[in-house]
C-alpha cells in the first residue's frame, strides 16, 4: 500500500489502513459460528498443553497423552476473506490455469469496518484497488444491531417490493466510503422505477413488427425525436461509464434513473405514440 501497488477509493482510507496495520492492536480472532475455518488448536485434557498444528495431532508433545480436544471456535471471517482471491482459483496448485490467468485480481469491494488482512501466501498483492463502501444504517442513522432491534430483514423487503427494488435503492443511495440510511420510501421509489421500466419495455414489445431485427436504421429513417433521444442516450452512457470507472455507482444509478424516467418514458414514448397509431 505504501509503495502504491494497492490504492484505496476513496483515497483517504489509505492512511486509515496504514495506521491500522502499524498500530499492532490486539484482535480477538475467534468466533462462535457454525460455519468457518475452525481454529487449528488442540488442548491436552491431561496436562493442559496447547497444540497448534496443520492436522490433528495424535499425542500431546508434552506429556504423550492421546486425550486431545479441539478448540470449538472458528476464525474470524477476515481470514476466509484474505484467502478468497486465490483459494477460489485452484490454489494451492500454483499451476492452476485459473490462478495463472485471473490472479492477481483487480478490485476488492469492502466496507470500512472490514479492513482486509493480506496473507503472504503468494508473494503478490491480491488486487490493485480497494473500493470502500459505507454501511447501511437505520432511518435514524444508527448502526443496525440485535441489541437495538433495528435490523431489516431483506427477505421481507424483497417479498414486498422485489429484489431489484432493494438492489437499486442500495446502489442509487451510495457514495464511496460514506454510510447511508435505510429508508423504506426509497425502496418504494425504486420499485416504482422498476415498474416504469417494465411498462416501457412492454409498450415497445407490443409495438414491434413481427419481422423486427435489432439494429439502428439508416439516418434517413430517423426523425428529430429519434435523433434527440439517441443523443441523450449516448451522453448518459458516456457519463455513466466515467462514473463506473471511478467507482461512483450511486451517480451512475441516478443518471440511468433520470434518463429512463424523465427522457425516455415521459418524453420519447409520448412523442412516439402518435407515430405508432
Predicted regions and their residues:
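Structured secondary-structure scaffolds
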Residues: 1-209, 229-272, 276
Amino acid at each position: 500500500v505504501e509503495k502504491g501497488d494497492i490504492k484505496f477509493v476513496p483515497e483517504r482510507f489509505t492512511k486509515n489502513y496504514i495506521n491500522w496495520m502499524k498500530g499492532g492492536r490486539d484482535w480477538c480472532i475467534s468466533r462462535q459460528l457454525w460455519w468457518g475455518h475452525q481454529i487449528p488448536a488442540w488442548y491436552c485434557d491431561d496436562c493442559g498443553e496447547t497444540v497448534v498444528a496443520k492436522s490433528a495431532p495424535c499425542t500431546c508433545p508434552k506429556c504423550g497423552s492421546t486425550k486431545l480436544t479441539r478448540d470449538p471456535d472458528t476464525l474470524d471471517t477476515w481470514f476466509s476473506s484474505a484467502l478468497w482471491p486465490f483459494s477460489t482459483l485452484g490454489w494451492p496448485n500454483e499451476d492452476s490455469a485459473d490462478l495463472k490467468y485471473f490472479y492477481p485480481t483487480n478490485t476488492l469491494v469492502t466496507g470500512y469496518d472490514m479492513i482486509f488482512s493480506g496473507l503472504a501466501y503468494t508473494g503478490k498483492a491480491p488486487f490493485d484497488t480497494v473500493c470502500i463502501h459505507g454501511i447501511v444504517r437505520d432511518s435514524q442513522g444508527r448502526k443496525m444491531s440485535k441489541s437495538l432491534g433495528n435490523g431489516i430483514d431483506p427477505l421481507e423487503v424483497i417479498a414486498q417490493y422485489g429484489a431489484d427494488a432493494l438492489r437499486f435503492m442500495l446502489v442509487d443511495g451510495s457514495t464511496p466510503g460514506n454510510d447511508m440510511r435505510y429508508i423504506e420510501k426509497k425502496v418504494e421509489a425504486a420499485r416504482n422505477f422498476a415498474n416504469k421500466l417494465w411498462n416501457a419495455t412492454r409498450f415497445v414489445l407490443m409495438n414491434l413488427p413481427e419481422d423486427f431485427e435489432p439494429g439502428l436504421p439508416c439516418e434517413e429513417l430517423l426523425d428529430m425525436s429519434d435523433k434527440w433521444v439517441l443523443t441523450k442516450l449516448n451522453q448518459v452512457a458516456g457519463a455513466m461509464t466515467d462514473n463506473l470507472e471511478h467507482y461512483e455507482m450511486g451517480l451512475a444509478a441516478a443518471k440511468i434513473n433520470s434518463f429512463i424516467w424523465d427522457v425516455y418514458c415521459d418524453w420519447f414514448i409520448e412523442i412516439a405514440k402518435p407515430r405508432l397509431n
